[in-house]
């Protein structure tokens, strides 16, 4: 086993990300669903899912996107932020769909005090929380689709995203700061 040449004192320690209140920090990521290409009820071919997680409460929002493009991401973010309000910190991976001019302008227009933080993709120290949500979305979506197929339905995955989000958000122990 090789020793690390940098002394332990000089190496950066892993610092967990803490958020105390709702909307302190939102983490967002895109999930690839290109192999499950399905049309939504309006005939649009959906290939991606955007997962947005409030870091303090664990509240998760998911929505389908036809393409991995910045203007579509900005539109969905504006829709979600219009409903629940904007975050203090907007945390993403370094993807071009999150660092594009239209997304940064949207954040600036909502509130010039929003801090946009980018981490490295698929890195547990930066993106671990939202990557866990991605896994959970895939797992819960699979079980909801299987359950509906057993009931004799042939559901489209884009039509059950609301049920998937509700299942994720209603799991026990999801809210970190729950005092009850």
Regions found by a protein language model. Give the residues of each.
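Retroviral integrase
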Residues: 1-139
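Contiguous mid-protein beta-loop-alpha structural module that forms a pocket-lining wall or clamp
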Residues: 118-119, 127-129, 139, 143-147, ...
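Charged, gly/pro-enriched flexible loop segments at helix/strand junctions
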Residues: 2-6, 105-107, 147, 151-180
């Amino acid at each position: 086993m090789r020793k690390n040449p940098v002394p332990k004192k000089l190496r950066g320690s892993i610092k967990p990300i803490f958020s105390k209140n709702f909307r302190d920090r939102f983490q967002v990521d895109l999930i690839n669903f290109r192999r499950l290409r399905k049309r939504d009820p309006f005939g649009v071919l959906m290939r991606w899912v955007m997962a947005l997680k409030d870091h303090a409460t664990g509240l998760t929002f998911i929505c389908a996107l036809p393409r991995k493009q910045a203007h579509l991401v900005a539109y969905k973010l504006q829709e979600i932020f219009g409903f629940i309000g904007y975050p203090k910190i907007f945390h993403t991976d370094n993807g071009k769909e999150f660092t594009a001019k239209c997304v940064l302008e949207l954040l600036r227009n909502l509130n010039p005090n929003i801090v946009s933080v980018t981490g490295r993709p698929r890195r547990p120290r930066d993106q671990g929380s939202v990557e866990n949500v991605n896994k959970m979305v895939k797992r819960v979506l699979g079980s909801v689709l299987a359950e509906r197929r057993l009931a004799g339905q042939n559901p489209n995955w884009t039509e059950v995203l609301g049920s998937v989000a509700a299942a994720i958000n209603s799991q026990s122990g999801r809210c970190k700061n729950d005092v009850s």
